[in-house]
Curated annotation (Swiss-Prot):
Role: Single strand-specific metallo-endoribonuclease involved in late-stage 70S ribosome quality control and in maturation of the 3' terminus of the 16S rRNA.
Keywords from the UniProt entry: Cytoplasm, Endonuclease, Hydrolase, Metal-binding, Nuclease, Ribosome biogenesis, rRNA processing, Zinc
Keyword Metal-binding: yes
Compartment(s): Cytoplasm
Protein name per UniProt: Endoribonuclease YbeY
Stored Gene3D superfamilies: Metalloproteases ('zincins'), catalytic domain
C-alpha cells in the first residue's frame, strides 16, 4: 500500500509555464512521490526559473548556480516534511541533453528529491551506487527507463 501524501504543487515565474505544467499533472506528481516514500509525507514541490533556483542554491548551499533539484528536508519521522525545488530551465536542458522527455526527467528528479528528504545521499561513491539503484527500481515500477 502506498503512503499518504499531502502535496502542494507550486509554479513560480516561468518563461514557458504551459510546457512545465503539462509535464507535471498533479496526479502524476503525487504518484511518483508516493512510490519513492517509505512513510507518510507532507511535501511542497515548487517549479522555479533560473534566477530563483540560483538564489536558493547560493543562499543555502553556497553554490552560485542554478541546479536541477534542491531538497529542503525538515523532518523524517513520523511524517516526512520537505520542500523540493526544481529549476525548470535546468531540468528542460538536461532532459534534452539526455534524450529524455521532460516528464520523464521531472519524475526522476522528484524521486531523487524524495529520497533525499528521507535521508538518502550520494556524497560517498558507495552511497551513490545504492541511491542510484533505488532510483532505478522506483522508476521501473513507475514504467520509466533506467535514468542512468
Amino acid at each position: 500500500m502506498l503512503n499518504q501524501l499531502t502535496l502542494s504543487l507550486q509554479f513560480g515565474k516561468l518563461e514557458n509555464p504551459a510546457l512545465h505544467r503539462g509535464a507535471l499533472p498533479r496526479h502524476k506528481v503525487a504518484r511518483w512521490l508516493r512510490h519513492a516514500l517509505q512513510s507518510d509525507a507532507e511535501i511542497t514541490v515548487r517549479i522555479v526559473d533560473t534566477e530563483e533556483g540560483q538564489a536558493l542554491n547560493r543562499d543555502y548551499r553556497h553554490k552560485d548556480y542554478a541546479t536541477n533539484v534542491l531538497t529542503f528536508d525538515y523532518t523524517q519521522e513520523p511524517v516526512v516534511t520537505a520542500d523540493l525545488v526544481l529549476c525548470a530551465p535546468v531540468v528542460a536542458q538536461e532532459a534534452k541533453e539526455q534524450g529524455k522527455t521532460l516528464q520523464e526527467h521531472y519524475a526522476h528528479l522528484l524521486v531523487h528529491g524524495a529520497l533525499h528528504a528521507q535521508g538518502w545521499d550520494h556524497e560517498a561513491e558507495e552511497d551513490a551506487q545504492v541511491m542510484e539503484l533505488r532510483e532505478s527500481e522506483i522508476m521501473a515500477r513507475l514504467g520509466f527507463e533506467n535514468p542512468y
